[in-house]
Design a protein with these regions (language model features):
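Conserved glycine-rich Rossmann-like NAD(P)H-binding loop of the short-chain dehydrogenase/reductase
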Residues: 174-192, 206, 234-237, 244-273
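Active-site helix of classical SDR
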Residues: 381, 423
Length: 511
């Protein structure tokens, strides 16, 4: 059985051996059996045979490697991006003043390849643990860049959390009026109402409930935007379904979502006024409007008598289960009250669709992914481009949030999640096909890869990767948001707009 030997044990051993060397007579006072055992142990330690010598060489190399790994792990832990992840609730790190950035940065014992440029580096950036200094400086500056978007109107989907949440804040803090959609409008409004600078932009944020899986509701939403706004400058198709979550994943949100909007906190109510107006207008147009209030007690279904179920009951639609969800033990895989750093339900399922291959994926999930990631963005671009074309300012943008999964020009393609790959490839083709025509009207359309922000693997596998490899995604959600916003912000600031490009790490790559 292995034993951890302390420094005191080693010092006592050395002192004993030195004592016997100084007074060899003491050796012969020992019982013969003990003396022979001592000589064998000392000799084996100082004069190992060939096999023992080889074993020690291997052990020595392993010990050196362990020390290098431990030192590098400690060094990476000091970077800003990793320090921010230690908090129970994610808070976007503030911009560090130049005087606060240490002149001397830590060096890695083992060289690594930069996440962005792939160059070998050992000098750690103060914020990023996966980038060389040059790429780290560029990426850090991009997190905090701004531009003047005063009087501009933006529509963004998937605005409630993570990348979409920070894109929305960047738009608001640059002066834009933002129409933000989400399936869970009450939760979204509560989140935004807690921002310190809420009073500076709250009158310019309009949150709407919208389930992009229900395309007739997306069409109705486009009608509303066409009637409500006489201009539209920015369209960001951010919402995406990567891993489908069963109804139990969203159950904790339903308490607030089922409340009448006038019973939510006052600051949250203010952000939902336009949504209320939209629903009232929708109700007045319904042929069954007189029965709408009576139908609130009925279960929500995809096929109801009133139009716009994806607007009226966007949150409730998340609670419609599929037959293949019945095998889940909801209380076990979605433990009540356990939320992650983004205040999302912890998901303890052993596997998810990110790990699945063709032949293992439910048809309904494949259809959902196409609706959210490709069909809804098509409808929004198709319909809202007419509003955008009313005035040619020469600096309007459509940004389709894509991913490397949708890229064709790769020599090797992993065989997992083909349904999400299909959807992102379709979104890329939409961008590639239509961008040139839109540019003639001063609308610049691009697709953007957000970078590796989230580990989509099941929780148990993600935990194992952390324990064994000290793995964390190289970027955070603010980096993802900055990448999405860059063609807009950098284009306005420099006057040079990307058009018809697939952007990764702020620069075009092959489709």
């Amino acid at each position: 059985m292995s034993k951890n030997i302390s420094n005191l044990d080693i010092e006592a051993c050395i002192a004993t051996l030195q004592y016997l060397l100084d007074d060899t007579n003491q050796l012969f006072e020992l019982p013969e059996e003990q003396r022979v055992a001592l000589f064998k142990a000392a000799g084996g330690l100082t004069r190992p045979n060939r096999d023992e010598f080889q074993r020690r060489r291997k052990d020595a190399k392993k010990a050196v490697k362990r020390k290098m790994i431990a030192k590098d792990t400690h060094a990476r832990k000091t970077t800003g991006i990793r320090s921010a992840r230690e908090a129970a609730l994610f808070v976007a790190p503030k911009l560090l003043a130049a005087s606060s950035i240490p002149d001397e940065t830590l060096e890695l014992e083992s060289p690594r390849n930069c996440y962005v440029c792939k160059a070998v580096y050992t000098k750690l950036h103060h914020f990023y643990d996966t980038m060389c200094t040059e790429c780290g400086d560029l990426n850090y500056a991009k997190r905090f860049q701004t531009t003047d978007l005063q009087d501009q109107v933006a529509v963004i989907t998937g605005s409630r959390l993570k990348i979409g949440y920070h894109i929305t804040l960047m738009l608001l803090r640059s002066g834009a009026t933002v129409v933000a959609t989400t399936r869970f409008p009450a939760d979204s409004a509560i989140r935004f109402s807690k921002e310190d600078d809420y009073n500076q932009w709250s009158d310019r944020l309009h949150i709407h409930g919208l389930d992009l899986r229900h395309i007739p509701s997306v069409e109705i939403f486009c009608n509303y935007i066409e009637q409500k706004y006489n201009r539209l400058d920015i369209l960001i198709n951010n919402a995406a379904q990567t891993v489908r979550r069963p109804s139990g994943f969203y159950f904790h949100l339903m308490e607030n979502e089922k409340l009448p909007i006038n019973e939510l906190p006052k600051l949250a109510q203010n952000l939902l006024k336009d949504h209320v107006s939209c629903l009232e207008e929708l109700s007045s147009l319904s042929v069954n409007s007189s029965n709408t209030s009576k139908n609130n007690s009925l279960p929500v279904t995809w096929h109801g008598p009133e139009p716009g179920i994806g607007l009226r009951n966007s949150a409730e639609l998340s609670q419609i289960p599929y037959s293949f969800d019945n095998t889940l033990q909801t209380a076990e895989v979605f433990p009540e009250g356990e939320l992650d750093a983004d205040l999302q339900q912890v998901d303890l399922r052993n596997t998810n669709s990110w790990r699945l291959k063709l032949g293992e994926i439910e048809t309904t999930e494949m259809v959902e992914v196409q609706l959210v990631n490709a069909v809804a963005p098509f409808v929004l671009c198709n319909r809202l481009s007419n509003v955008m074309m009313k005035e040619n300012t020469g600096k309007k943008h459509i940004i389709n949030v894509s991913a490397m999964e949708g890229k064709f020009h790769r020599f090797k393609k992993a065989d997992r999640h083909p349904h999400t790959n299909m959807a992102k490839a379709a979104l890329n083709m939409l961008t590639h096909t239509s961008a040139t025509t839109f540019a003639k009207s001063g609308i610049y359309m691009n697709a953007v890869d957000t970078g590796w922000v989230t580990d989509e693997d099941p929780a148990a596998l993600s935990k194992k990767k952390v324990e064994i490899h000290d793995f964390q995604p190289p970027l955070d959600i603010v980096d993802g948001a900055a990448r999405v916003m860059d063609p807009l912000i950098d284009g306005i600031n420099t006057g040079k707009h990307w058009c018809g490009k697939f952007l990764k790490d702020y620069f075009p790559i092959d489709w």
